[in-house]
Amino acid sequence: MKIHRLAGYIQNIYLVEYPTKLLLLDGCCRADVDTVYQFITEHLNRPMTDLKLIVVTHMHPDHAGGAYPLRKLSGAKIAASNAPGQWYQGLDGLLMHLTDMALAWWVAGRLGKKRQNLWYNRHLTPDYYLATDAQLPYFEEWQAIHSPGHTDRDICLYHSASESIYIADLLVKVKGELMPPFPIFYPRRYLNSLLMLKTLQPKKIMFAHSDEMNLAEINFATILDAVPETPMTHWRSVKAKARRALGFKRSSLRR
């Protein structure tokens, strides 16, 4: 087994290579489809049909956006959490889907990337639904570990033989420091997911938005202190900013 890390549009892409098959640890962005295609067919000199499984760790644009196009190109199967329903369901879900793509463009701008088409289907119908601790189809040495909090359906992917784990957005790096991601819809579940990682004691941790680390490099005490007690979501953020702006305006009028 060899794990290749590719530079994606706004995140790392992890492609696991075996002699007869390939595993994509996350669904990446729609803008990353050509990157994955070229790496497999040109760098590895392998047919796209060697890609057997694409895991979608959660439904955000940089983790699910390329799943359907890559399945169409390769015939690979898609696996995702067995969380009920769709993450982006209803009118609120549609608005959140649009907001998340706008946030992805904002991140791209901060990274100096040109704006690219990130549109993808907000509803996912995977070929396999993964229960917690389930083995991945075709790749039994990999295990799906549910790690909700960021959303209700986040999963990490653990390779027990090498004691390596891909944690997607469980932690992100901002200004050189690891911290909880935005948003966090379920703070208590998120706290439990962090404790799971700490208890598991992996030797290598792979991030979507940071370089690889070992467990000793992570200051869990600081991170655990930063976990919010209430949900930290798009709408709460907008409301809080509106209240602050309104309060400032009223204060200025009183002067």
Language-model segments: residues:
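Anionic-ligand binding region
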Residues: 126, 131-134, 144
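Binuclear metal-ion centers of metallo-dependent hydrolases, dominated by the metallo-beta-lactamase
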Residues: 212-255
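Short N-terminal helix/helix-N-cap motif within the alpha/beta-hydrolase-1
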Residues: 33, 59, 64-66, 152, ...
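Active-site HxH/HxHxD metal-binding segment of metal-dependent hydrolases
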Residues: 41-127, 230-232
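Short, charged, surface-exposed secondary-structure boundary motifs
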Residues: 87-92, 175-180, 239-240
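Residue-level marker for buried hydrophobic side chains located in beta-strands
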Residues: 23-25, 55, 78, 164-166, ...
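Metallo-beta-lactamase
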Residues: 28-31, 141-222, 227
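Conserved beta-strand hairpin/beta-sheet module of binuclear metal-dependent hydrolase folds
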Residues: 1-43, 156-172
